[in-house]
Regions:
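Membrane-proximal, glycine/serine-rich, low-complexity loop/turn segments characteristic
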Residues: 1-3, 7-16, 22-27, 44-276, ...
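Entry/capping segment at the start of metal-dependent catalytic domains
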Residues: 31
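Residues that line or immediately flank small-molecule/substrate-binding pockets and catalytic motifs
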Residues: 41
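Small-side-chain secondary-structure face that scaffolds active or pore-lining regions
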Residues: 166-191, 221-228, 275, 288-385
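Detector for glycine-centered tight turns/loop "hinges" at secondary-structure junctions
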Residues: 21, 246-248, 327-328, 371
Length: 385
């Protein structure tokens, strides 16, 4: 969340962001497309933008062409992302000791015998007395980011242009040790955008500006929602059950779900976002009527849509209970199975679809007196639907 006025912001509202004069998300821009950023607040923003500018205004101007030969700029960036401030997880032995202590303080019988505690401590029977760090099993320590930018600037006597291509690819933090060979449930995000800004001097007094921006992005994630999966990593004790049992079936029980199985064995979801931003602005110099007078007409069309493709399945899992003789020696294992292994099933859903058409008409007047005084006045008509 971004604030212009800090704690003075009304109703915790965010500022109005205008890109080349139209309200659009900052996330649609790469840094190579930005020419300048201007921040307005208080009376300055209120005067021009009314209620929309009550929490401040951020004006972003994208780059334009130049009246000379083409210039090409390209760059590539690679980054390694590392999560931080992740808690240390209690191991199975520590959990078992704490559980026994809690029960003892409540006047109840302990859950784990001394031989059970020793098995947790030594790891002699990891199937019945597991020590699973669910954070490490589900997540890995590093993710990667790739970013490529290319821009082309140029023009001639009456036409100039700026064009840019931007690609961003993020590969996430899911541990791939248990991934299915049939699909990937890795967290990933890929975005491709292309921009074209065109300036045309139609006459000596008429300037036409055309801006086009298209975006395609794709987001891949496990079928289990993040809001469900990540709390599960912290809720399931290290001593609850193994990731997989000796029979090759996912570990689990009828109370808690297996975080690893939930992250890799339930399928995956792919989110697709599409966006088109287009605007046309005509600027007419009216200095033939009076010096400093000009008029503008502008129209913009924005079309954004998001939809999800889901391929989901169920999985088989089993809980284990040791069978002990009178002396406390384990003689057998009781296996109770839940769920069933199914094939992937397909479904889709529409996230959102927005279409916005904006029209703006403006008359500007500028006057300077001996470089000591300056007058700027504007009459603006704005319509959005």
């Amino acid at each position: 969340t971004m604030y212009v006025r800090g704690l003075a912001t009304m109703g915790a509202g965010t500022p109005l962001v205008l890109i080349d004069g139209f309200e659009r998300p900052l996330s649609s821009l790469s840094q190579d497309e930005i020419e300048s950023v201007t921040v307005l607040k208080d009376a300055a923003s209120q005067a021009l933008y009314g209620v929309r500018g009550a929490n401040g205004v951020i004006l972003v101007t994208t780059k334009r062409g130049i009246l000379e030969g083409m210039k090409v700029h390209a760059s590539y960036q690679f980054g390694i992302n590392t999560p931080f401030r992740l808690p240390d997880m209690a191991d199975g032995y520590t959990y078992a000791l704490a559980m026994n202590e809690a029960l003892r303080m409540d006047g109840l019988s302990v859950l784990y015998s001394n031989s059970d505690l020793e098995a947790f401590r030594t790891g002699s029977n990891p199937e019945l007395f597991p020590n699973v760090n669910w954070k490490d099993e589900v997540l890995k320590n590093k993710g990667t980011t790739h970013q490529f930018n290319a821009s082309f600037t140029g023009g001639g006597k009456n036409v100039s242009y700026f064009a840019a291509i931007n690609y961003i690819g993020d590969n996430g933090f899911m541990n791939e040790n248990y991934f299915s060979p049939d699909y990937s449930s890795q967290m990933s995000w890929d975005k491709l955008s292309a921009r074209a800004n065109l300036d045309i001097n139609a006459t000596k007094l008429t300037l036409v500006k055309l801006n086009l921006l298209g975006e395609l992005s794709q987001h891949n994630r496990p079928a289990t929602e993040y809001s469900t999966l990540f709390p599960m990593i912290y809720d399931v004790p290290a001593a609850a059950f193994p990731v997989k049992t000796s029979t090759g079936v996912w570990g689990g029980d009828n109370v808690r779900k297996n975080p690893v199985a939930e992250s890799v064995a339930k399928g995956f979801s792919v989110g697709n976002d599409r966006a088109l931003y287009a605007d046309l602005r005509i600027i007419q110099d009216l200095s033939v009527l009076t010096s400093g007078l000009s008029a503008e007409l502008a129209i913009a069309y924005d079309n954004r849509a998001s939809y999800w493709d889901n391929k989901t399945k169920n999985y088989l899992y089993e809980s284990l209970q040791p069978v002990k003789d009178n002396g406390g020696t384990i003689t057998d294992i009781t296996r109770t199975r839940y769920g069933q292994e199914t094939d992937l099933s397909f479904s889709s859903s529409l996230g959102y679809q927005n279409r916005v058409t904006t029209f703006e008409a403006k008359v500007n007047y500028e006057k300077n007196w001996q470089d000591m005084h300056q007058l700027n006045a504007a009459v603006i008509y704005y319509q959005e639907e």
